[in-house]
Amino acid sequence: MVFVAMRVKYQFGSLKSVHAVVYGLFIFDPSGGDTMKICRANALRLWEEYFGNSQFAEDFHGNLMCRDGYGDDDFYVYRFGKRIYCGWNIHHILPLSCGGTNEKHNLICTNIYTNDEAEDKITYWIDDCLYQVQRVYGTGEHQIIKIN
């Protein structure tokens, strides 16, 4: 099984006004982070960055995703005579409610089931696997760790 750990940079503290400049579909803020509006076009760009032209990929839990199934929770394929739901969407590694952002480094493609199970928690079970979002020691970055 291939496990992809994503990292995110974030900042706690008081809110500051941010003046953003829009370049194409991505929004870049003056602090150096790049924020991504979550929409189909940007989701497909993110897919291409991580998976290239592949039609199918697995998320961090191993659930199947199909490029054509973005945003469709009823999208499925048949594999070995079994219906497999492979719709996908964008998951925030560090949830927005916990200080996460829409920076590309905080976003990952996941099967809709995976995203629904993770919700906006930093510790969560998916099937019989326990995951936790943990800060990388000495940095402001975060990653998803499989605990068991």
Question: What are these model-predicted stretches?
Answer:
Residues G13, G24, G32-G33:
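Residue-identity detector for glycine
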Residues M1, G32-G33, I147-N148:
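Short intrinsically disordered terminal tails
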